[in-house]
């Protein structure tokens, strides 16, 4: 048995992108007995599992065990089920309903998708309030009491019938209700985490054999699980983040701890100049599946580009000038540049590309005539650049303004066309990036640690890949390049974009590697890691 603890919660917008879920899907497809374990309150768990595309995957939630919830499915509470008391007037505002009595707010209902009840807050005359949080199976899962200052006074977890099981006080101490005492080892706990660990341990002990447990490095429960449950586990496996490591995983307390990285680049970045330890492994959570996109059309010259980070200012400027010159030299190329708006390096690179455009063409994007032209183009989607210029000539003449010279008209049109072929996407969603790759000809990731999921999608789509960080899927010079220097990008790109023979060779290699990185081969790697069959 494998227990997987995903790292998404009630607020996660895209649980389908969770690494633990990706691994669970591989296990499910290969009949590995697996269960998702959730160690935190999760009133909308069924909703999130549906979003994650695993609605019927076996799961266990510790709070169901705590609250004695005997069923997995149910019908959510909806707005029409909320009673309307006499003398109370409701007001709707998209996902919120406010109820007033004689001008005083007495109840607030917060909704999901305009009709599913998430919580109801009741207000008394003194400003104190009680909030009932609803499970998406239709019952109140916990109740919170707050004073007029908004401070939590106590919180109770309830059975589906509405009986309190546990009550947490303002000092975090948790008291077990007498009626439920026999299900717990203590009448009082220091905090709710102690109860959670007790119930997870009990659940593990009901299994026929010690399970392997897979957790994500940045899961807030990681230390608690390893501190308290290590003796109950056959093996603990940590899915390491690609970047932004929150802790030193090597210091985690477990004798049989394994670290799994999504790529060689991620592992190398984590260990730096040190030799990777024997308990560190590279297994992609994303299987490759052959699904060729539009990239096999020679006319399609879309390049999906992840801009670089960690470059010196001089190198950033040089790279930007290189990208600009490539686009200026080949009017068929289109670059979709994905940047993290919080990365100064990537934002700077974007700005330097624009500066290089203006320097080459001789006009800035802040030029008054250019801005008028661009805004007119946006309003006239079906018109050509020449048509819009003719229109502006007429408008300028009517307004007795100095006409735009032929030379400047050419500069404006050239600047506009370049801007249309260098499309900057600020912090695009993973879904958006995966969609772009399916329509691209080459995938370029200039970041120090490339994204494993994007790499797997590029392989599945048949694209050549060009990266700076190590790439498990690249056979150097055949289906891609791992660059020693980002400045080598122009030669690497033209190798695939300007020579159909090279592009076809890359496609053949990608098809071969899709089999190599299939679900079957991934599960073989996982089984080897967990010592199955020994």
Model region roles, listed by residue range:
Residues 253-279:
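A short, active-site helix/loop in glycosyltransferases that binds the activated sugar's phosphate group
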Residues 429-440:
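Short acidic alpha-helix that forms the nucleotide-activated donor recognition element
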Residues 501-531:
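A charged, aromatic-enriched C-terminal amphipathic alpha-helix characteristic of glycosyltransferases
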Residues 419-429:
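Active-site donor-binding acidic/aromatic loop of nucleotide-activated sugar
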Residues 1-83:
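N-terminal subdomain of nucleotide-sugar transferases
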Residues 75-194, 198:
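Repetitive, compositionally biased segments used for assembly/scaffolding
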Residues 447-508, 512:
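Catalytic binding pocket for nucleotide-activated donors in carbohydrate/polymer assembly enzymes
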Residues 288-404:
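Conserved catalytic-core segment of nucleotide-activated headgroup transferases in glycan assembly
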């Amino acid at each position: 048995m494998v227990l997987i603890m995903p790292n998404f919660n009630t607020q996660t917008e895209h649980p389908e992108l969770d690494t633990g879920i990706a691994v669970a899907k591989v296990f499910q497809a290969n009949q590995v007995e697996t269960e998702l374990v959730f160690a935190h309150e999760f009133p909308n768990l069924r909703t999130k599992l549906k979003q994650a595309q695993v609605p019927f995957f076996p799961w266990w939630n510790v709070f169901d065990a705590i609250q004695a919830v005997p069923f997995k499915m149910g019908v959510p509470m909806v707005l029409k089920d909320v009673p309307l008391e006499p003398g109370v007037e409701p007001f709707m505002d998209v996902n919120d309903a406010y109820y007033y009595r004689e001008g005083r707010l007495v109840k607030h209902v917060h909704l999901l998708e305009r009709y599913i009840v998430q919580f109801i807050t009741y207000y008394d005359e003194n400003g104190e309030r009680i909030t009932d949080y609803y499970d998406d199976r239709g019952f109140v899962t916990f109740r919170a009491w707050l004073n007029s200052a908004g401070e939590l006074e106590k919180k109770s977890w309830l059975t589906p019938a509405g009986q309190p099981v546990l009550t947490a006080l303002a000092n975090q101490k948790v008291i077990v209700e007498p009626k439920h005492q026999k299900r717990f080892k203590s009448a009082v706990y220091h905090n709710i985490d102690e109860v959670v660990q007790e119930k997870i341990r009990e659940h593990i002990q009901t299994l026929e054999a010690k399970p392997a447990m897979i957790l994500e490095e940045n899961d807030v429960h990681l230390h608690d699980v390893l501190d308290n449950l290590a003796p109950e586990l056959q093996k603990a496996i940590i899915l390491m983040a690609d970047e932004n490591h929150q802790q030193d995983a090597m210091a985690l307390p477990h004798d049989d701890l394994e670290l799994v990285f999504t790529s060689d680049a991620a592992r190398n970045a984590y260990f730096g100049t040190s030799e990777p330890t024997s308990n560190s492994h590279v297994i992609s959570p994303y299987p490759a599946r052959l699904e060729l996109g539009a990239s096999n059309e020679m006319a399609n010259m879309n390049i999906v580009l992840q801009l670089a980070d960690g470059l010196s200012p001089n190198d950033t400027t040089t790279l930007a000038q290189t990208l600009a010159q490539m686009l200026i030299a080949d009017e068929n190329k289109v670059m979709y540049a994905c940047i993290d708006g919080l990365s100064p390096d990537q934002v700077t690179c974007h700005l330097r590309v624009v500066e290089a455009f203006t320097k080459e063409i001789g006009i800035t994007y802040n030029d008054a005539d250019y801005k008028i032209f661009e805004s007119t183009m946006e309003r006239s989607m079906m018109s050509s650049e020449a048509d819009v210029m003719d229109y502006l000539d007429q408008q300028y003449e009517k307004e007795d303004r100095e006409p735009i010279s032929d030379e400047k008209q050419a500069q404006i049109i050239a600047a506009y066309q370049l801007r249309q072929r260098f499309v900057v996407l600020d912090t695009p969603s993973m879904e958006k990036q995966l969609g772009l790759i399916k329509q691209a000809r080459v995938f370029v990731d200039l970041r120090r640690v490339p994204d494993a999921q994007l790499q797997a999608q590029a392989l599945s789509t048949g694209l050549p890949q060009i990266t700076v960080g190590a790439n498990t899927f690249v056979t150097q010079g055949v289906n891609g390049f791992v660059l020693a220097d980002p400045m080598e990008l122009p030669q690497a790109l033209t190798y695939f974009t300007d020579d159909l023979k090279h592009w076809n060779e890359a496609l053949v290699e990608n098809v071969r590697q899709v089999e190599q990185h299939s679900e079957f081969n991934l599960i073989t790697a996982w089984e080897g890691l967990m010592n199955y069959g020994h």
